[in-house]
Amino acid sequence: MKDEPRSTNLFMKLDSVFIWKEPFGLVLIIAPWNYPLNLTLVLLVGALAAGSCVVLKPSEISQGTEKVLAEVLPQYLDQSCFAVVLGGPQETGQLLEHKLDYIFFTGSPRVGKIVMTAATKHLTPVTLELGGKNPCYVDDNCDPQTVANRVAWFCYFNAGQTCVAPDYVLCSPEMQERLLPALQSTITRFYGDDPQSSPNLGHIINQKQFQRLRALLGCSRVAIGGQSNESDRYIAPTVLVDVQETEPVMQEEIFGPILPIVNVQSVDEAIKFINRQEKPLALYAFSNSSQVVNQMLERTSSGSFGGNEGFTYISLLSVPFGGVGHSGMGRYHGKFTFDTFSHHRTCLLAPSGLEKLKEIHYPPYTDWNQQLLRWGMGSQSCTLL
């Protein structure tokens, strides 16, 4: 990557100052199972493009993709710069014992803490792309059918197994009554009268996740859906109402096609509710009032934000993607992926001569040369000089 020149002050006009991007070295990528190709290969390409060598650990949960990656990648890539390691938590733990130059992990906050703890042993820098409970506020002035279309699409996409999917809706009881029939209409239009047979609705990744999600169906009251089929690992697109903050469905990231609705009376109450929780990976607000959307944006914190829209921003390579606080640290996508896997090294190349010009920097310092230094360095009052 070409170096990036940077501006200088008067005393450095003869110097060359630039940012040199160099590879970290050996990078460990621990990939997730929900989008096992995209969330593996995007990172692999970024790390290799930055010049690093990669140890790639695909998720053992998406077994088919794990096997394909292990078999196909060595056929097309130089094996001296990467390795694919198969296995489960034990193998991942063994990898984390080694001295690495960078770790990129995508997964749950619980495992993210394990990864970060292991990284501290060698002070290894990390990017953690974690999850969270993503709120979706719906204002009373919204058209319920428009909201239903957009929320149902990005809630049930990939059977809800998406880290930026809405985890719950916040709205007034009045909006809930208008929203429920609209959601039912949308679900039928998207997936038909028998969603289980729809080619447009995904199923749950494995039995463990299925059992976890089916247990959540017992929370609150099922207003839409609620059906399940263990042999098919099918959970119907579901909406829960009368949901309390203390219930299990509100205590963990759902990561499935279940949408709880929590009642609030105002945008202020919604914001207070959101700010009582950990910072989410994404936050959504629907309102015909730009003031309401801006309030939600300005008075909360999240990895990303969508006003009157879902997670379509993740398709853009021009903006970074990442969490904040409990939902992660670091960023990637597009050039940001390259930058994540690069050490940004500040470089200054000065002439070997011209010593007379440098003497102004040396002690003893008089009032005159201090004034000259301040003038030559500009108004950088927070620098050493």
Swiss-Prot record:
Question: Which InterPro entries is this protein grouped with?
Answer: Ald_DH/histidinol_DH (IPR016161), Ald_DH_C (IPR016163), Ald_DH_CS_CYS (IPR016160), Ald_DH_CS_GLU (IPR029510), Ald_DH_N (IPR016162), Aldehyde_DH_dom (IPR015590), Aldehyde_DH_NAD(P) (IPR012394)
Q: Please report the PTM annotation for this entry.
A: Geranylgeranylation is important for localization to lipid droplets and enzyme activity.
Q: Name one Pfam family in it.
A: Aldedh
Q: Report the Gene3D superfamilies cross-referenced here.
A: Aldehyde Dehydrogenase, Chain A, domain 1, Aldehyde Dehydrogenase, Chain A, domain 2
Expression across tissues = Salivary gland. Expressed at protein level in placenta.
Binding sites annotated in the UniProt record for NAD(+)? G107, S108, P109, R110, V111, G112
Question: Quick one: which pathway?
Answer: Alcohol metabolism; ethanol degradation; acetate from ethanol: step 2/2
User: What are the UniProt keywords, alphabetically?
Assistant: Lipid droplet, Lipid metabolism, Lipoprotein, Methylation, NAD, Oxidoreductase, Prenylation
Give this protein's Gene Ontology molecular function annotations: 3-chloroallyl aldehyde dehydrogenase activity; aldehyde dehydrogenase (NAD+) activity; aldehyde dehydrogenase [NAD(P)+] activity; long-chain fatty aldehyde dehydrogenase (NAD+) activity; medium-chain fatty aldehyde dehydrogenase (NAD+) activity
Q: Where is the lipid attached (S-geranylgeranyl cysteine)?
A: C382
Where in the sequence is the active site?
Answer: E129, C163
Tell me where the signal peptide lies.
none
E.C. designation(s):
1.2.1.3, 1.2.1.48
Residues excised as propeptide: 383-385
- Name the family the entry cites: Belongs to the aldehyde dehydrogenase family.
Role played: Oxidizes medium and long chain fatty aldehydes in lipid droplets into non-toxic fatty acids.
What PANTHER family does the entry give? Answer: ALDEHYDE DEHYDROGENASE, ALDEHYDE DEHYDROGENASE FAMILY 3 MEMBER B2
Protein name (database record): Aldehyde dehydrogenase family 3 member B2
